[in-house]
Amino acid sequence: TDTWTIEEAMNESHLLLRNVQPAAAGTVVGAALDGDGDRCLIIEATETGYKVVDGDAIADLLLKAAAKNSPNSQWHLAASIESDLALLSNPCSGLEIMTSETAVGDRWLSVELRKNGLVGEEMPKLFGVEDSGHVVLPSSHPQLENQWSLVGDGAATLVSYLLAKS
């Protein structure tokens, strides 16, 4: 994960980093979506500057929020082979988590998660993640009642992260 001191950020060539203002540690100070908007990386303030919050760290926070908001529920987390090993081998306590490791790419995350079935009134308790900021989340199907789709949506990832932090 990339980190910068406040001074380093002020001298960066990247416009976002140059313009980030000092903030309390843990404050989200920026976010970046990729070109087609399906990935999200977040910039948070630290004690000495800033850090990038990658997909694995986003997934970790989402799981902690799930444990707090719906303890003892069953979740399925799929992560690509590039993800942090700790994410799959030592998931958050308070949840029953089935983990799966997949090839790189949101396609393979979706293939693995679809095995759970995507039918029901309640949102399926599953998501997939790549360290690159690609988080595959369930979304209600726009035309089929009680059916769910899987989407990689950077804006939805950002909103999910912000809600999990609150």
Predicted features, each with a name:
Residues T1-K165:
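Phosphate-binding chemistry for phosphorylated carbohydrates and sugar-nucleotides
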